[in-house]
């Protein structure tokens, strides 16, 4: 078994445990990169109730935020916890519908922030205490992209 196979196996074991702890029945896919080149580490697909983790994209995010891949597995755990947060969000269908129906950019931005904040709130309950500082940094970095337009639109 090579290093890549061990890494995938580690991720699958971590994911199985995290999904079980969350009571989440979503299916898991593991791929290398998010299509189109954007730095998306994970994606929840509500129509198929599937979470996809993008390992090389997560690795790149980890390098950009922390300067190395030292925190890769904890980072992947946090990304998965966030995606589980989307999967477990009972308000996601209504929020997504409101997002799609809205023609106003400020409203869309506020809805996107709510969707992301809900997922992070749920994820925070899944992440072990020893990963809290790392979780906080990743969450803050992720949410800043959603908060900035909302704050700018409020002024």
How would you name each of these model-derived features?
Residues 1-45, 49:
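Basic, amphipathic N-terminal segments that precede the first structured/catalytic domain
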Residues 1-6, 43, 72-74, 107-113, ...:
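Long, well-structured alpha-helical subdomains associated
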Residues 3-4, 62-70, 103-106:
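Short, flexible/disordered intra-domain loops and linkers
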Residues 9, 75-78, 82, 117-121:
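A structural signal for well-ordered alpha-helical segments within the folded catalytic domains
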Residues 31-74:
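Active-site scaffold of zinc-dependent metalloenzymes
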Residues 73-100:
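Catalytic Zn2+-binding segment of zinc metalloproteases
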Residues 90-121:
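Post-HEXXH active-site segment of zinc metalloproteases
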């Amino acid at each position: 078994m090579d290093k890549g196979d061990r890494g995938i196996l580690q991720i699958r074991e971590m994911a199985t445990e995290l999904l079980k702890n969350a009571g989440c029945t979503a299916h898991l896919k593991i791929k290398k990169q998010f299509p189109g080149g954007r730095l998306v580490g994970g994606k929840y697909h509500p129509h198929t109730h599937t979470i996809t983790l993008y390992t090389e994209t997560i690795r790149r995010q980890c390098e950009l935020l922390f300067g190395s891949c030292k925190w890769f597995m904890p980072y992947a755990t946090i990304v998965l916890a966030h995606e589980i947060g989307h999967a477990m969000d009972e308000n996601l269908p209504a929020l997504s519908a409101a997002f799609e129906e809205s023609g106003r950019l400020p409203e869309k931005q506020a809805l996107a922030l709510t969707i992301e904040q809900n997922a992070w709130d749920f994820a925070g309950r899944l992440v072990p205490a020893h990963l809290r500082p790392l979780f906080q940094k990743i969450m803050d970095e992720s949410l800043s992209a959603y908060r900035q337009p909302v704050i700018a639109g409020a002024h």
